[in-house]
């Protein structure tokens, strides 16, 4: 059911007139969700294999381009994207706006010059919690442009994706926006890849006794009660570039019927990230895993796109109503560090 559902639901279709611009598009996970909701997209991405993947599978065109402030974009009614998140990831060095990989000045500049009806970006949860000072700056700059800016931490598992994946979703608009409702039930690993687990014939993916021993030592030292295998009766752990492509202690792995354990293959990882089976990836295996690990789950993107469609069709608020909806950055109600920590960051 899950496989058939994503294969059909996420097929691109053109039913909307609004044009969507996807910045830092990656392989097209976010764009795929918007195309499935009926939008036309155009993307920009600096990684060649990801661009090739996007162009192989989507109706829109992705351009190989390293973006910078002042870049000349085509007209767009909606801007979406995933500004590089490495500076804020719990796995990164957390240098924030001092990091050259920070894409927010570019995203804000695009919004400033194109003035879309709606914008939406995805980033790691850590941006809103450990880096309140920078997130407030981003929201303040976007609010100055005349947008109501709202955000929420969403877990993809609550929207049909068979994976626990918390991400910060931020939306700017001039009307009203409702985040998608939580789905009734969670999709499990077994439902997503159960037909693949024991049919994959790739001996190179089988964990060696030495790798099993290394993992056992790691889990003992980290007080891990249950092995970090993927369990058929529950959703997967968060997929990352590191635990997909690397042979590490926290690698994504399944247990076979004969007791051996195996690393995931690309198609299994893609399913767990809600990419349809007809969606084909370009590049080496490592590059394909990186594309999957960095992507916005298309099924989550689709749910967000449907909500954006509702907002896009609403009349723009009058000035009085707009001012009543603007929320000061320090009233977001999130648990952050204190002012001293902000100044030291």
Where are these regions (language model features)?
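S-adenosyl-L-methionine-dependent DNA methyltransferase catalytic core
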Residues: 1-40, 45, 141-145, 153, ...
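Core alpha/beta nucleotide-donor-binding catalytic domains of modification enzymes
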Residues: 2-115, 125-127, 136
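Short catalytic/ligand-binding loop motif for oxyanion handling, primarily in non-cytosolic enzymes
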Residues: 31, 86-90, 127-130, 160-163, ...
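Short Asp/Glu-rich motifs
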Residues: 53, 72-73, 130, 161-162, ...
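Short aromatic/basic micro-patch
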Residues: 82, 118, 263-266
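Proline-centered helix-kink/hinge sites
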Residues: 83-84, 116, 162, 276, ...
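Short, conserved loop/turn and helix-capping segments at secondary-structure boundaries
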Residues: 97-101, 132, 136, 183, ...
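Conserved Class I SAM-dependent methyltransferase catalytic core
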Residues: 103-164, 169-172
């Amino acid at each position: 059911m899950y496989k058939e559902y994503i294969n059909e639901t996420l097929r691109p279709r053109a039913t909307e007139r609004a044009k969507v611009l996807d910045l830092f598009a990656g392989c097209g996970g976010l764009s795929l969700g918007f195309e499935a909701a009926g939008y036309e997209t155009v993307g920009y991405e600096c990684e060649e294999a990801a661009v090739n993947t996007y162009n192989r599978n989507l109706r829109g065109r992705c351009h190989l381009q390293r973006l910078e402030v002042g870049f000349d974009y085509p007209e767009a009614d909606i801007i979406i994207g995933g500004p590089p998140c490495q500076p804020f990831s719990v796995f990164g060095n957390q240098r924030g706006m001092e990091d050259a990989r920070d894409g927010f000045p570019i995203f804000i500049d695009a919004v400033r010059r194109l003035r879309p009806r709606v914008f939406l970006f995805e980033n790691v949860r850590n941006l809103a919690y450990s880096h309140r000072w920078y997130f407030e700056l981003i929201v303040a700059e976007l609010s100055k442009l005349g947008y109501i800016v709202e955000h929420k931490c969403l877990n993809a598992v609550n929207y049909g994706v068979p994976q626990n994946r918390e991400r910060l979703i931020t939306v700017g608009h001039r009307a009203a926006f409702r985040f998608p409702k939580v789905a009734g039930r969670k999709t499990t690993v077994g439902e997503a890849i159960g037909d693949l687990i024991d049919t994959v014939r790739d001996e190179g993916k089988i964990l060696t006794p030495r790798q099993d021993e290394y993992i056992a030592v790691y889990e003992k030292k980290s007080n891990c009660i249950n092995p970090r295998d993927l369990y058929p009766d529950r959703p997967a752990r968060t997929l990352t570039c590191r635990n997909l492509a690397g042979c590490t202690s926290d690698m994504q792995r399944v247990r076979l019927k004969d007791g051996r354990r195996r690393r995931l293959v690309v198609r299994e990882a893609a399913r767990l990230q809600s990419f349809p089976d007809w969606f084909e990836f370009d590049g080496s295996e490592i590059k394909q895993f990186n594309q999957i690990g960095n992507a916005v789950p298309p099924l989550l993107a689709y749910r967000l796109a449907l909500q954006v469609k509702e907002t896009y069709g609403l009349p723009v608020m009058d000035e009085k109503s707009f001012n009543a909806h603007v929320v000061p950055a320090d009233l977001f109600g999130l648990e952050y560090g204190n002012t001293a920590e902000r100044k030291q960051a």
